[in-house]
Amino acid sequence: MRQIMILLVRFYQRAISPILPDSCCFYPTCSSYMITALEKQGPLLGLLMGLARILRCNPFNRGGVDPVPDKFTLLRNPHPEEYEDEIIARKFHSH
């Protein structure tokens, strides 16, 4: 079930997302967050975390770095600064 859900998100990333304007206010993007949440938490909790993240992604939220926490939560990662340097380094040095 987890792999099917990940395949659906990857389909969205490759077929649908490129034709839409950029709108995610977070890093990683909501679709990448969903995949990581599914991998870390399994299909049910991962889906709930991903949907909660999508609901947080709106013009009234400041956005920013919000990696998937190691423990299940429907709230924003309480300590994104712990990951920020690692994420920024990965983003700019992976090319």
Swiss-Prot record:
One of its GO terms (cellular component) is plasma membrane. InterPro entries: Membr_insert_effic_factor_YidD (IPR002696). The keyword Membrane applies. It is a peripheral membrane protein. It holds the Pfam family YidD. The keyword Cell membrane applies. Keywords: Cell membrane, Membrane. It is found in: Cell membrane. SMART domains: Haemolytic. PANTHER family: MEMBRANE PROTEIN INSERTION EFFICIENCY FACTOR-RELATED (PTHR33383:SF1). NCBIfam families: membrane protein insertion efficiency factor YidD (TIGR00278). Belongs to the UPF0161 family. Could be involved in insertion of integral membrane proteins into the membrane. This is Putative membrane protein insertion efficiency factor. It comes from Lactobacillus delbrueckii subsp. bulgaricus (strain ATCC 11842 / DSM 20081 / BCRC 10696 / JCM 1002 / NBRC 13953 / NCIMB 11778 / NCTC 12712 / WDCM 00102 / Lb 14).
